[in-house]
Amino acid sequence: MGKIIGIDLGTTNSCVAIMDGTTARVLENSEGDRTTPSIIAYTQDGETLVGQPAKRQAVTNPQNTLFAIKRLIGRRFQDEEAQRDVAIMPYKIIAADNGDAWLEVKDQKMAPPQVSAEVLKKMKKTAEDYLGEPVTEAVITVPAYFNDAQRQATKDAGRIAGLEVKRIINEPTAAALAYGLDREVGNRTIAVYDLGGGTFDISIIEIDEVDGEKTYEVLATNGDTHLGGEDFDSRMINYLVDEFKKDQGIDLRNDPLAMQRLKEAAEKAKIELSSAQQTDVNLPYITADATGPKHMNIKVTRAKLESLVEDLVKRSMEPVRVALQDAGLSVSDVNDVILVGGQTRMPMVQKVVADFFGKEPRKDVNPDEAVAMGAAVQGGVLAGDVKDVLLLDVTPLSLGIETMGGVMTSLIVKNTTIPTKHSQVFSTAEDNQSAVTIHVLQGERKRAGDNKSLGQFNLDGIQAAPRGMPQIDVTFDIDADGILHVSAKDKNSGREQQITIKASSGLNEEEIQRMVRDAEANAESDRKFEELVQVRNQADQLVHGTRKQVEEAGDKLPAEDKTAIESAVAELEKVAKGEDKADIEAKIQALVQASAKLLEIAQQQAQAGATADAGDSAKKDDDVVDAEFEEVKDKK
């Protein structure tokens, strides 16, 4: 059985880790980096770039460079959060036929899981290059506050990338696993504050250690799936745009190229202000008008950035209060605070968290790598390589059905340990009702319409009876991935209907299979392209080497051989520009055969050179005079 790898599929950056013996190891990608930007670009010549190469070309290709796709995964186009992104993203977000938020790139419609799969493929390849064997299984992390549709969409992305997703685990829980891996932690309560690129989570976790066995029990979780570093960047971008408009009278929001340059500069300035008190945003030739080119040069202080994002940091603290309350704990009950996610490097975030908990957060957990390492630990647990670890996670939101009067009746309340199963008996609202619609909801509001609809199904064939008489047993079953299975059974007739909740949104099986096939086809075409490039390089080297040998052979090469070689070289150069690998290989062979005489001459010259060298060496030896000598020691 191969390794089960751990993947942190992040909004801004992604990371992959494996278990190496008893330690989790983060792997470097092909660029030599331990994290990979979650950026995907589709170039004009049909190439798909992922990570740093995609980020590098974003300025010149903003409409076809996709980032922060995790914010759209499992979302409806009309969701308030999706609409916020529609307004600010340089790429095109559209409504799919089923109402989901999809993307349009070069007139092609794409689902967010399909795009995220490109990042997962890069993670998979990174692990395969390190291990030297195929990788087919993974544990993928998601924000703790992801709903059912978002979790399902993440699993779909894994399948499209050619991975069997053995488990979906919550990011803060993964960070806790990484924290406890090499430590004698004893019994502790920890708070994991996870502020990433696009999402925020807080989890209160109890670690119990008995006879070396560690149990990680999530007591409560809360969060905001649309709050993260991207929002901090947006505040900085808006400030810079407004300042430039005040100064130059030009609104850069209408210029996608300028906005992409500005996005990079804003992110860089934000990072610099974590260690410096002031930075310059200097962008020459940012735009131009009738009077000529315009340059941006704006000083930004740390205090200014803090004033721009103060409300975002405060917004993150409300879920922290709720999580503590749900766990039935006070601030003094928390032993350790762990910060996860790149945005927690901001001093203001660290200070607000430290002030709230009354203690400094731990500095020995890498905020960028802890989640992937924890996912690798869970992979090790599932593979049987890691013993003595038990993980008890929770469902982040209440689950229930719509009942009479448009009310949500919860069957499983939030922060229930998973996996779990719960049944409740309901009845009909009308006399002689022959069918009921089970409308499944997720959320904390009493009014059904204010919660997230996960889907609905009908149970028909109910025997005619006065209202309130039939007994319909509804069962909710949440698996270890946090994904819901629902069944409804009429106790009288025995008729049963069951579904795995795949929201009215989401990809159907046919779409997933098509995307899997597309991904496989792309992998095949990528492999063929790589082989073609290798053969072209081989042809190029052969042409260069042959020309050099012809020159060195001079008059020793018969004229007819020289003509044949030059003709074969010209033929090879011509086909090397084409796409036919077999044709290039055939012309390489033709040149090798035509160069037989040339090879013979080259070998003769090499032998002659070797003989001459040997003669010179012997002559030098003859000139050597043997001398006797004795060692004279210095007098001390």
Curated annotation (Swiss-Prot):
Region (Disordered): 604-636
Biased composition (Low complexity): 604-615
Molecular function terms from GO: ATP binding; ATP-dependent protein folding chaperone; unfolded protein binding
Keyword terms of this UniProt record: ATP-binding, Chaperone, Nucleotide-binding, Phosphoprotein, Stress response
SUPFAM superfamilies, sorted: Actin-like ATPase domain, Heat shock protein 70kD (HSP70), C-terminal subdomain, Heat shock protein 70kD (HSP70), peptide-binding domain
Induction: By stress conditions e.g. heat shock.
Residues found modified as Phosphothreonine: 199
A Pfam family recorded for this sequence: HSP70
Source superkingdom: Bacteria
UniProt xrefs under PANTHER family: HEAT SHOCK PROTEIN 70KDA
Family membership: Belongs to the heat shock protein 70 family.
UniProt xrefs under HAMAP family: DnaK (MF_00332)
NCBIfam families: PRK00290.1 (NF001413), PRK05183.1 (NF003520), prok_dnaK (TIGR02350)
Role description: Acts as a chaperone.
Protein name: Chaperone protein DnaK
Organism: Photorhabdus laumondii subsp. laumondii (strain DSM 15139 / CIP 105565 / TT01)
Taxonomy of the source species: Bacteria, Pseudomonadati, Pseudomonadota, Gammaproteobacteria, Enterobacterales
